[in-house]
Amino acid sequence: MTGFTIEGSSLKLLKPQEQGVVSRIDSSRGDFVAQKLRSMNITLGTRVTVEQRSPRFLLRVGADQVALSDPLQDAIYVRLSR
């Protein structure tokens, strides 16, 4: 897992109620991961808010709340926002 950089952070490092804008989706994780994220409306430029980290990782995407598995979390990098 990559930590913070000038460009942003791994989604997994955000705490509940922190927001970010999706800046990168790791394509090395395969087409299935990218397709699954698209089906959840998570694409480059999408604003997301971490709602909960455990027992399930819940993310607010617009008006929707989605649960992300570890592989999906690992694929998302965000630029922090306030």
Curated annotation (Swiss-Prot):
Gene Ontology molecular functions: transition metal ion binding
Short name of one Pfam family: FeoA
InterPro entries, sorted: Fe-transptr_FeoA-like, FeoA_core_dom, Transcriptional_repressor_C
Keyword Disulfide bond tagged: no
GO biological process: iron ion transport
Assigned keywords, A-Z: Ion transport, Iron, Iron transport, Transport
The keyword Zinc appears for this protein: no
Transmembrane annotation, as ranges: none
Family recorded in the similarity comment: Belongs to the FeoA family.
Function of the protein: Might be involved in Fe(2+) ion uptake.
This protein's name: Putative Fe(2+) transport protein A
